[in-house]
Amino acid sequence: MDKLVLGGHEFNSRLLVGTGKYGSNNILPEVIKESGSEIITMALRRVDLDNKQENILTYIPKEMTILPNTSGATNAEEAVRIARISRKMGCGDFIKIEVISDTRYLLPDNEETIKATKILADEGFIVLPYMTPDLYAGRRLIEANAAAVMPLGAPIGSNRGLQMKEMIRIMIDELDIPIIVDAGIGKPSQAMEAMEMGADAVLVNTAIASAGDPVQMARAFKLAVEGGREAYIAKTGNVSEFANASSPLTGFLGNL
């Protein structure tokens, strides 16, 4: 069976979801259910063990794999510190590295991300680094023992789609590591396109959370990701510059 494998762990769903920007946390369980997702990311600052109502973990089903992120880190040192706190709080070994010092476009700092990835991978973390699409940075993250790489499709929260499509395509073609397209995906059709290209998974948050009906949108993304993966495995037909008839154009009337 076709499974997503991250750090030796197998997952049936190739859709990862987030926890931010929802009007109410109460909708999260239903969103997660309809998405079919098995991995959910969250900022560590949203975990409040002393306040059940404010603790995001209260709303996440126990069977989900938690992917804490280092949101708020502006350099490798801060990201490493957040990851270690996450482990001490019982959030497990998965960690999504986010190192962002740019406050306007929120673009990840690849150099600091590589540094943090190496340190945390050496400590036994299953590291999924969020990155600006770049082949050379991707290779260095592999050398740093990342479990996957997470190139952005467009600036985070923008819903602009796959603006970095060609750079992501190069990474898919050249890197022997799971590629999870993260950030910028605004429509199910864009998630499907990423999967048709050969991405191993996508992470979607804003597009679901900001939808008129987040629950229905979660299901739409589930179906899109599944359809895109099926199309990639089936291998789409060749693109032709000219028309090609699907039925013979000659000989029929002459035989009557």
UniProtKB/Swiss-Prot annotation:
Active-site annotation: 96 (schiff-base intermediate with dxp)
Keyword Cytoplasm applies: yes
EC number(s) per entry: 2.8.1.10
Family matches, as InterPro entries: Aldolase_TIM, Thiazole_synthase_ThiG, ThiG
Molecular function as annotated in GO: thiazole synthase activity
GO cellular component terms attached to this protein's record: cytoplasm
A biological process from GO: thiamine diphosphate biosynthetic process
Localization, UniProt: Cytoplasm
Keywords for the protein's UniProt record, in alphabetical order: Cytoplasm, Schiff base, Thiamine biosynthesis, Transferase
Binding site for 1-deoxy-D-xylulose 5-phosphate: 157, 183-184, 205-206
The protein's assembly and partners: Homotetramer. Forms heterodimers with either ThiH or ThiS.
Family stated for the protein in its record: Belongs to the ThiG family.
HAMAP family reported for this sequence: ThiG (MF_00443)
Protein name (record): Thiazole synthase
Gene encoding the protein: thiG
